[in-house]
Amino acid sequence: MLKTQKDKKLENCFSTNNKTKKKKNIIVGLSGGVDSSLSAALLVEKGWNVEGLTLWLMKGQGSCCSEGLVDAAGLCEDLGINHKIIDSREIFEKEVIKKTTESYEKGLTPLPCSMCNKNVKFEEMLNYAINKKDFTHIATGHYARIKKSSYVEKLDCKSFVFKEFLLLRGADENKDQSYFLYSLSQEVLSRLEFPLGEMKKEETRKEALRLGLRTAQKPESQDLCLVEHYGSMQRFIDKHIEPKEGEIMHVNGKVLGTHNGIQHFTVGQRKGLGIAWPKPLYVKSLDRGKNIVYVADKSDLFNKEAIISKVNWVSIVEPKQEIEVEAQIRYRSHPVKGTLIPLKNLDNPTKNFKLIFEENQSSITPGQAAVFYKGDILLGGGLIN
């Protein structure tokens, strides 16, 4: 059974080996789920001085009564560690709710989890740790890994200049969450721990049971926190964006029907179009200015190029010449080979790249992330323009 930090402190009083050993202090982000719970427990077991931190994100969500907050607080009590809730509703509203809404209004398909990771979750955790002064590290339950640059010495990666800390895929390829972390900085990586990075999901559940964690049997959440809060992404959109009628038009120019807002559509969508045609049609593109949803045959959805903007180079120094990468253009897709070319003729030349795929790709979706890998190493990523 897991010993609490309270028990370990008593042990240390009688251990001559620990008299000169200084514990590292770490803040663990706790959602109340099994992954973050196990992360905290494993760090306690390894001898870290742990404090749990839960972000209060949603307006209309009480700080004392949501299931996640209650489970996080209970877990910390079980482990004998401190637990803190900080009110992050304003920054979440500004950086996630507002920006997600604006993206849908522009006809984009945003990635709220990435927005949250970049501007809310890790920022809030790191600032909290820094303000406490004696806390040096932060941790989350993400399935991803961090390595030092020496990791690449035996790899064929001569075309890249690596930074000190590298972000890697999680060992469990089915649970890997590195795609959502492409916006992290070296400062964050230097202080960040992923206790579950080397584990498989089934091992996580077994470990949680072994340690007797109260969240060990808790079902895994499959949805975005926005979906969990609003019930569906459709309800989120309806609450934040006014309907505006427009046309659904075939790419050949024929009007096939009407819609009540481009925010309800995404590139590649087939279901819910409400139109009649001899064979299945898919959303090809969204024209915000004309408020038109363009549809086409599936064969018309394929493209070999995309412009990637707001690129963040996580693990390597920004390349000045074209490089070969493995690009992932949606969370559950497999990475595909491509060439990334810096663009010199756009307003912000250091942040815009042309991505040319080796083979045609279907439904390249504006607003989603294109994340670049070399094997397991996440090089960087940006937004599909």
UniProtKB/Swiss-Prot annotation:
GO terms for molecular function: ATP binding; tRNA binding; tRNA-uridine 2-sulfurtransferase activity. One of its GO terms (biological process) is tRNA wobble position uridine thiolation. InterPro entries: MnmA-like (IPR004506), MnmA-like_C (IPR046885), MnmA-like_central (IPR046884), MnmA-like_central_sf (IPR023382), Rossmann-like_a/b/a_fold (IPR014729). The keyword Nucleotide-binding applies. It catalyses: S-sulfanyl-L-cysteinyl-[protein] + uridine(34) in tRNA + AH2 + ATP = 2-thiouridine(34) in tRNA + L-cysteinyl-[protein] + A + AMP + diphosphate + H(+). ATP binds at residues 29-36, 55, 141. SUPFAM superfamilies: Adenine nucleotide alpha hydrolases-like. The active site is at residues 116, 225. Residues 175-177, 330-331 are annotated as: Interaction with tRNA. Disulfide bonds join 116-225. Its EC number is 2.8.1.13. GO terms for cellular component: cytoplasm. Gene3D superfamilies: Adenine nucleotide alpha hydrolases-like domains, HUPs, Translation factors. The record marks 142, 368 as: Interaction with tRNA. The keyword tRNA processing applies. Keywords: ATP-binding, Cytoplasm, Disulfide bond, Nucleotide-binding, RNA-binding, Transferase, tRNA processing, tRNA-binding. It is found in: Cytoplasm. It is an enzyme of class 2 (transferase). Its main location: cytoplasm. PANTHER family: MITOCHONDRIAL TRNA-SPECIFIC 2-THIOURIDYLASE 1, TRNA 5-METHYLAMINOMETHYL-2-THIOURIDYLATE -METHYLTRANSFERASE. Catalyzes the 2-thiolation of uridine at the wobble position (U34) of tRNA, leading to the formation of s(2)U34. Belongs to the MnmA/TRMU family. This is tRNA-specific 2-thiouridylase MnmA. It comes from Prochlorococcus marinus (strain MIT 9215). The lineage of its organism: Bacteria, Bacillati, Cyanobacteriota, Cyanophyceae, Synechococcales.
